[in-house]
Regions:
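NAD(P)H-binding glycine-rich loop region in Rossmannoid oxidoreductase-like domains
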Residues: 40-77
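SDR active-site strand-loop-helix element
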Residues: 5, 29, 54-58, 96-102, ...
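Adenosine-cofactor binding site in Rossmann-like domains, unifying the SAM/SAH pocket
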Residues: 20-44
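Mid/C-terminal beta-alpha module of Rossmann-like enzyme folds, strongest
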Residues: 194-195, 201-246
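NAD(P)-dependent short-chain dehydrogenase/reductase
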Residues: 136-183, 188-197
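Catalytic helix-loop patch of NAD(P)-dependent Rossmann-fold dehydrogenases
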Residues: 76, 80-84, 91, 104-148, ...
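NAD(P)-cofactor binding segment of oxidoreductase domains
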Residues: 54, 68-97
Length: 250
C-alpha cells in the first residue's frame, strides 16, 4: 500500500491525481488524519495502513515566516515530523520518498552553474536548515530512501508563483517582479512522475535533483513574463532590494 503525507498540498494533490489515473491504490493523509509532529499518531496510522511505500510531501514552506513567528512550527513539521515519518517507515519496512529543496545550499554559485547532489549543503535560512536536518534524519533512520531536491515548484493546486501572478493580473495593469534571482521552475506533475518513477523502478537509493528542463536559468521576472504573455499586463523588472525579505533566497 502507498501512503501519501501532506496529501492536500499542491504536490500531494498532484500525486493523488496521478495515482488515480493509473488506478493505483493509496491512502492519503493530511494533518487531520495524521499529524506528523505526533509520533503516536504517526505510528497508529502506519500500523493500520501497513505501507510499503511512503511519499512524504508534508512540509512547512513559509520561508520568511520560518525566520521568526513560524520558527517553531517550521521545526516541528520539517524536523520532528520528518523524523517521526522516517522512523515509522523503517519500522514497517517501507521505502521513503522525501521532498527537499534548493534552500539546503548557500546559493552562491555563478549564474548558470548547477548544484550537484554531492555539493556541500550550506543552508542560509531557517527553512533551509530544517529541510537539511530532515534530509539527515531520513538518511539516519531509513535504509530505503529517495531524497529529491527541487526548486520553484508550481502546479494547478495550492499556492504558488503562477497563481499569485494570475491573481495580481486581475487587479493590476503593471507588475514589478525581481530580475536578479535565478532558478529553474518545477511543475508538480513532473515532480510527481519522477517520484513514482524512482520508487516503481526501484532506482538506486539516495539523493536526486530535479527541475524542469531548460537551456539556462530563468528569473522570477522571466517566469512572470511567460505566465502573463497572453494578457495586457505590463511586467517590469526590478532589483530584489525593492522587495526586502526575511529569508535569503538561494
Amino acid at each position: 500500500m502507498i501512503l501519501i503525507t501532506g496529501a492536500n498540498g499542491q504536490l500531494g494533490t498532484e500525486l493523488r491525481y496521478l495515482l488515480d489515473e493509473r488506478n493505483e491504490e493509496y491512502v492519503a493523509v493530511d494533518v487531520a488524519e495524521m499529524d506528523i509532529t505526533n509520533a503516536e499518531m504517526v505510528e497508529k496510522v502506519f500500523a493500520e495502513v501497513k505501507p510499503s511505500l511512503v511519499y512524504h510531501c508534508a512540509a512547512y514552506t513559509a520561508v520568511d515566516a520560518a525566520e521568526d513567528e513560524g520558527k517553531e512550527l517550521d521545526y516541528a513539521i520539517n524536523v520532528t515530523g520528518t523524523e517521526n515519518v522516517a522512523k515509522a517507515a523503517e519500522k514497517h519496512g517501507a521505502t521513503l520518498v522525501y521532498i527537499s529543496t534548493d534552500y539546503v545550499f548557500a546559493g552562491d554559485k555563478p549564474v548558470g552553474q548547477e548544484w550537484e547532489v554531492d555539493d556541500q549543503p550550506d543552508p542560509q535560512t531557517e527553512y533551509g536548515r530544517t529541510k537539511r536536518m530532515g534530509e539527515e534524519l531520513v538518511e539516519k533512520y531509513s535504509s530505503r530512501f529517495y531524497i529529491i531536491r527541487t526548486a520553484w515548484v508550481f502546479g494547478n493546486y495550492g499556492k504558488n508563483f503562477v497563481f499569485t501572478m494570475q491573481n495580481l493580473a486581475k487587479t493590476h495593469k503593471t507588475l514589478t517582479v525581481v530580475n536578479d534571482q535565478h532558478g529553474r521552475p518545477t511543475w508538480t506533475r513532473t515532480l510527481a512522475e519522477f517520484m513514482t518513477y524512482l520508487a516503481e523502478n526501484q532506482k538506486e537509493f539516495g539523493y536526486y535533483h530535479l527541475s524542469n528542463d531548460a537551456t539556462e536559468d530563468t528569473t522570477w521576472y522571466d517566469f512572470a513574463v511567460e505566465i502573463l504573455k497572453d494578457t495586457d499586463v505590463e511586467v517590469l523588472p526590478v532589483d530584489s532590494s525593492k522587495f526586502p525579505a526575511k529569508a535569503k533566497r538561494p
